Curated annotation (Swiss-Prot):
The protein's name: Uncharacterized protein YdbB
InterPro entries with a match to the protein in the record: Cupin_2 (IPR013096), Germin_Mn-BS (IPR019780), PKS_Associated_Protein (IPR052044), RmlC-like_jellyroll (IPR014710), RmlC_Cupin_sf (IPR011051)
Gene3D superfamilies: Jelly Rolls
Pfam family, one: Cupin_2
GO MF term (any one): manganese ion binding
Organism per entry: Bacillus subtilis (strain 168)
CDD domains from the UniProt entry: cupin_YdbB-like (cd02226)
Highest taxon above the source species: Bacteria
Cited PANTHER family: 16.7 KDA PROTEIN IN WHIE LOCUS
Family: Belongs to the SchB/CurC family.
Domain spans labelled Cupin type-2: 41-88
Length: 113
């Protein structure tokens, strides 16, 4: 049975600087809720596209080979599998991320040039 969830109410319960957890599964994909301030490591997903949907705040997504994307509330961006990227935020940001349940994350040790 499905259950209704208020995403911002769930996010408001998060007190940590960084939290990322699954809130739902749709077929072979998971929907994750992230609440964070700061930056995540450079990485890529060799086997899954990744969809970001910002609910609150401002999410910066840096890429190895193109300009930084700036997403605000109600903006979304699809990142194709294999694309090296990282997320950053200078203010508390709440976003959804949709990706394959078994998506692999490959951390890049050095910042790409």
């Amino acid at each position: 049975m499905s259950k209704m969830q208020n995403l911002l109410a769930i996010a408001n319960e998060v007190k940590e600087k960084h939290a990322n957890f699954s809130i739902s599964e749709v077929n072979d994909h998971c929907v994750r809720l992230a609440v964070f301030t700061g930056e995540y490591d450079w990485h890529h997903h060799p086997d899954s596209d990744e969809l970001f949907i910002v609910l609150e705040g401002e999410l910066l997504i840096d890429f190895k080979d193109k300009e930084t994307a700036v997403l605000k509330a109600n903006d979304s961006l699809l990142i194709p599998k294999g694309t090296v990227h990282r997320t950053r935020s200078y203010v508390r940001t709440v976003n959804l991320c949709v990706e394959h349940k078994q998506a692999e994350t490959v951390i890049i040790e050095e910042q790409p040039c």
